UniProtKB/Swiss-Prot annotation:
It comes from Influenza A virus (strain A/Bangkok/1/1979 H3N2). GO terms for molecular function: RNA binding; structural constituent of virion. Keywords: Host nucleus, Membrane, RNA-binding, Viral matrix protein, Virion. This is Matrix protein 1. Pfam families: Flu_M1 (PF00598), Flu_M1_C (PF08289). Most abundant protein in virion. When expressed alone can form virus-like particles in transfected cells. Belongs to the influenza viruses Matrix protein M1 family. Residues 165-252 are annotated as: RNP-binding.
C-alpha cells in the first residue's frame, strides 16, 4: 500500500458515511494525484461543508495544506487553527511539544505513527496545530504519520461507540437504527437509479420505503416492525442491478 493510499484510508475512516464522504474521497484522490492545485478554493470548500466535526475539518485542512503546493505567504485558516488547538487545554499543549521533539528526530512515516499512537487524540491534534502554524517543522512523511495516528485514535473511539449501539438490547434504539438504515439505503437506491431510464421501479420501491419509515415514525409502531426492512430493500436493489447487468453483492 502506498503512503498516500494509507493516508486516504485513515482520513476517510473518520468521515461519516454519506454523499459528502464520496465527495471528500474524490477531492483527496484529486489532491494526491496533483490534479487540484488551488489550495485557497479547496479550503473554502472544506470550511463550508456541513455535518463534519471541527476536528475532522481541521485534519482534512492539514492534509490539504501538506499536499497542495502553495505560495509561502498564504494565510493559515482560522477554522483549522481552532480545531487543532487541543481544546485550549495546556496539558494537551505540553504533551504536544514533547511529541513534536520526538517527531523532529524521526524521518519515516511508520516510525512517526508508532511514536504518536501512545499519545491522546487531544495531544496529537495540538501537535498538528504546532506544525500547521509553522511553529515547528517536520518532513511530510512524518506529518502524515501523525495524521494517521490521530485518525486511528478517533476511529477506535467511534468504533467502540458504534459497537455499543449495535450490541444494545434496548428495543427502541434498535428499532430506530433499523429505520435510519432503511431510509439511508432508500436514498442511495434513488441516487443509483436516477441515471437510468429503466429506474422507475427501483425509484418506486425506494420512495415507498421512505414513506413507510416516515409513517412508522409519525404513528409510533412496535419495535419489532422494522425487522428486515433494510434487507428487503437491498434485495430489491440487487434484483434491479442484475437486470441492469451489474453484479454487486457487497452491500450486506
Amino acid at each position: 500500500m502506498s503512503l498516500l493510499t494509507e493516508v486516504e484510508t485513515y482520513v476517510l475512516s473518520i468521515v461519516p458515511s454519506g454523499p459528502l464522504k464520496a465527495e471528500i474521497a474524490q477531492r483527496l484522490e484529486d489532491v494526491f494525484a496533483g490534479k487540484n492545485t488551488d489550495l485557497e478554493a479547496l479550503m473554502e470548500w472544506l470550511k463550508t461543508r456541513p455535518i463534519l466535526s471541527p476536528l475532522t475539518k481541521g485534519i482534512l485542512g492539514f492534509v490539504f495544506t501538506l499536499t497542495v503546493p502553495s505560495e509561502r505567504g498564504l494565510q493559515r485558516r482560522r477554522f483549522v487553527q481552532n480545531a487543532l488547538n487541543g481544546n485550549g487545554d495546556p496539558n494537551n499543549m505540553d504533551r504536544a511539544v514533547k511529541l513534536y521533539r520526538k517527531l523532529k528526530r524521526e524521518i519515516t512515516f511508520h516510525g512517526a505513527k508508532e511514536i504518536a499512537l501512545s499519545y491522546s487524540a487531544g495531544a496529537l491534534a495540538s501537535c498538528m496545530g504546532l506544525i500547521y502554524n509553522r511553529m515547528g517543522a517536520v518532513t511530510t512523511e512524518v506529518a502524515f504519520g501523525l495524521v494517521c495516528a490521530t485518525c486511528e485514535q478517533i476511529a477506535d473511539s467511534q468504533h467502540r461507540s458504534l459497537r455499543q449501539m449495535v450490541a444494545t438490547t434496548n428495543p427502541l434504539i434498535r428499532h430506530e437504527n433499523r429505520m435510519v438504515l432503511a431510509s439511508t439505503t432508500a436514498k442511495a437506491m434513488e441516487q443509483m437509479a436516477g441515471s437510468s431510464e429503466q429506474a422507475a421501479e427501483a425509484m418506486e420501491v425506494a420512495s415507498q420505503a421512505r414513506q413507510m419509515v416516515q409513517a412508522m415514525r409519525a404513528i409510533g409502531t412496535h419495535p419489532s416492525s422494522s425487522a428486515g426492512l433494510k434487507d428487503d430493500l437491498l434485495e430489491n436493489l440487487q434484483t434491479y442491478q442484475k437486470r441492469m447487468g451489474v453484479q454487486m453483492q457487497r452491500f450486506k
